[in-house]
Amino acid sequence: MRLRGLCAAATLALFCVAPAAPSPQARAQDTPDPALENAQYWLGARGPDELELSLVRASEAHVGQSVSVTLRLDNTSESAVDNLQVTARRGDAVDTTTQARQQLAAGAYQYYGPSVSAGSLEPGESREVTLEVPTALGDESTLAITDPGAYPLLFTLTGTRDGEAASFAEERVLIDVLGDPAQHEPAADSDSEAEERHQFSLIYPVTAQLDVVPGDTGGQDLILESENLAGQFAPGGRLDQLVETYLSHDLHGSGCMAVDPALLDVADRMAAGYTVNPSRPSIAQRPKRLRDSWFSASEQDRGDPGTGSADAAAWLDKMRTVDCTMLLPWANANTDAVAEANNAWLTHEALERGADTVSRILGTTVNSELTAPASGTTAHEFSVPLVVADNSTWVGNATTFDSSLGALLAESGSMPQTVGYSNPELRYDFAEDSEQARALTAGASISVAAAQEDQKDMVAKLPNYLDPAAARSVMETTQRLLDAGQLDPRPVTALPIKSAQEGPDGEPGSPYPDPAAFREAEIAQVAQQARYTDELMSIMVNEPSIALTRYGFTLPLRRDLLIALSDTTRTSLRGNAQAARASRERLQKNSDALRDLRSSVSLIPPGNVYTRVSESSPLLIVAENGLPLPVDAHLAYDAPDGATLSTQDSVHIPAKGSITVSMTADLPSDMDRTSLRLWLATPTESDGPAGHLISEPIDITVQTRAGIVSVYGVGIVAALALALAALFRLGRRKKKKSHG
């Protein structure tokens, strides 16, 4: 039961037009993989529906008034269904967000309301029905709602298939039922009421999937795989709506936008111009001969100019007007996975680069030092304080948010997230309920949390991958409660930062299994590539005449690794498999790019056999560098016992150039030929370990003086033999002539 579009959500007064029904192919792509790893941690309650029942729109709900609800029916099966009927039911009002989650997962819904007939549907057919749901006690088929509050509603779709009765689908939603609009509700101004109000703060994340083509290096133009981001930056696009929604609501200073610095960086580069292409040309290509370039199609393979530069620039202008900013990890990377990769530069880019990026692009400083990871938990200590769930344990410094409210808010949007800090018994495929229903639920959950009596402070953290419909619903409800004095605004900058808190077993992190956690093999691959990137950087040398630095050149390669560790769609049941696949593909392409860059620094063998005129004759070999910066490398070798090479401590190869390296050799005199293997390695300290291999090893054979003498001796003997044979034949001919 899904709605394929995003509709405005203002409390429950949401009116939008349903988009066309999705194609069977689209449904197939969104369907969870039945063989999903750790399926028991994703699906704890509610099974899949046979058909789809999706909330399209609903009128604002008030006590004693009817609610008009429009739903769409989609027959996604391969057979016809008949005698369809949609019925409305409700459960008791919920007092806590935990109760709300329990009702949505496995509620009783014991109060029955009206039904409406929906006829028959052939395979692939869709239909909309409108249901008037009375709430007054005296009405017929009423849900009998007499008090304001948050109520769980259930819409069921039943009918027959091949003459057999069946239940085909359900749609569950939490709605905010307001009081009678004719009765004025004064704001809570008394001292006693003020003491009962929650201090409220809201964290509003903004991020997106970044499809920068892997293998990017410093100094290169931006290449994107698609125009997906351009569409989100355009007026009415997802990112444009998110910023507009934040700016158009007054949260009385209680809200703060948690922005992904990687998104800002890509938007800034898009504004300067970019290209759309599924691949990128190698920057380490060796020069080609003219005739080799005649039939090259490389110029035709460079892609098309991007069309979203102006929209990206306009979006950044809006971002510069945001009143409060804080940070997400770079590319919304999983902070625990970054820590387990155990690379200092990678951790720096994930958590410490963001503030400088905001300052450089937006011209402002971040208002809060807090960073909000998508996981909502941390098992590692970082240099910056994190925002974590209040039911988790952590090391380092952190502030906490309401975990139950956070789990309920995370269920909203086109990519509903299964967060690791949520109770597995209350998990299910949240996308079984439509986006519109979950947007309404998100808004109502703020009202529920605001009315809870068991807590005084309230921090609402929206999901890191936020959609406009849910954002509008939450912001409308929040502003209504703040305007009415039912919440006390507290700036995010005023949130208390707490020191390490360990759990009963001493293990920090999530209290429950996280189904989206990165596997050890994935982290090991990232760690390996991060190390290779460090090694590549270590051989390059900054050149005063070249603006590009070695760190700047390798920086995009590290950022590729952070994109591969992104939680943006990985934490969603229906996005996990595709996210894991995209991560593997990015790591493979990044590995290919690293291999290409490393192989551009190479040794060129002098031929199969290198002949020395004398023992003091030097060996000459050419070292080539295809990188845009000079390279300092160590010439390493492997030789048989008794053979040694005297090489330079460091070989300096100019940028995009080559150099001839001279070395002397002390080779065994009793051997005709000596085989040597040479390669370039990372620089080493005098007493340090051997450097890591950079170039592919080459094999050369050195012919010694003894070998030369041996060859000459064989040649002389052969020449004498030929001369004697010729003299012998000549003598025989003379004898024959004399006898003739």
Mark where each language-model region is:
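Secretory targeting and sorting signals
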Residues: 1-28, 717-731
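Acidic, serine/threonine- and proline-rich intrinsically disordered appendage/tail regions
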Residues: 43-44, 59-63, 189-192, 675, ...
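Contiguous beta-strand segments within globular domains
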Residues: 48-86, 133, 611-620
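Short beta-strand and strand-turn-strand segments in soluble, beta-rich domains
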Residues: 93-119, 639-649, 655-657, 671
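Short glycine/proline/serine/threonine-rich loop/turn segments at secondary-structure transition edges
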Residues: 137-153, 669-677
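Active-site beta->alpha N-cap acidic-glycine motif
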Residues: 171-173, 177-318
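Catalytic grooves of carbohydrate-active enzymes
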Residues: 245-251, 353-365, 376-602, 683-685
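Membrane-proximal extracellular "stem/stalk" segments
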Residues: 544-708
